[in-house]
């Protein structure tokens, strides 16, 4: 069996969890469902150890891999933004006995997944109806998603090929759009100095917003986790409800700015671990109002679809799409 016909080990590595699967890149639905596993990254000293453990658990071997990591990839090295792992591509490949290993940014993988998503993998959160593009159609998409941090990327489709945009856009400065948000920025600046979008739009960001909302109300916020904030909001707690409202509005404003920055008129995909959990809030909040409220471009923005990705393993799917694209670039393979 040739290397290109063997399953590829794909991974989606975040600051909290590591997900692995085998993928058959010849298929439109490449993930082998019975091979998908999730592990806590804190349980392993390195990515190589986690990958080797996974292969042992499923009783499989692989000679190639595509690992999507939540951090910047710089040549041979990647650093997980919210975890102390420092990953060397060459050392990890040698540890696993791989002939080929690609390290890509996790939101490059989220972007690549768009090329394999179907209509039932997404839920519309406003804008014109989205129809998956036909092969060869040019498309520009943005991708943004809150989880442990805030990931930002994009995808350009040209001539049947996918070109992901790897960015660290979650770390751009937070631009408040209301007097309340200006006050939130002031409060968070006292703790963090510079305040990035990720300080608000992610799991820990919910807690940060809640603390600021409580401070403005003269209320002790307590020691809460993100899940506590959303649970309190569901039970009618005023500060928690306001926190969710602010979160959704700011998320919409940032997503709209991303569309303008990238020229992503074909749509923005909302991914990350929080998006499915907060879907109802996003659909019944100021998300789209702030998304569309872009001055002279408001009428154009009203047509841009925003789509919540509901596929449970979009990062793995995108890593598989990247592997398939890499195979087309391999020597001796016709484009």
Curated annotation (Swiss-Prot):
Catalytic reactions on record: D-glucose + ATP = D-glucose 6-phosphate + ADP + H(+)
SUPFAM superfamilies: Actin-like ATPase domain (SSF53067)
Bilayer-spanning residue ranges: none
GO (cellular component) term, any one: cytosol
Compartment(s): Cytoplasm
InterPro entries for the chain: ATPase_NBD, Bacterial_glucokinase, Glucokinase
Binding positions (ATP): 11-16
Domain of life: Bacteria
GO molecular function, one term: ATP binding
GO biological process: glycolytic process
Keywords linked to the UniProt accession: ATP-binding, Cytoplasm, Glycolysis, Kinase, Nucleotide-binding, Transferase
EC id: 2.7.1.2
Keyword Secreted carried by entry: no
Protein family membership: Belongs to the bacterial glucokinase family.
NCBIfam families noted in UniProt: glk, PRK12408.1
Name of this chain's protein: Glucokinase
Gene name as annotated: glk
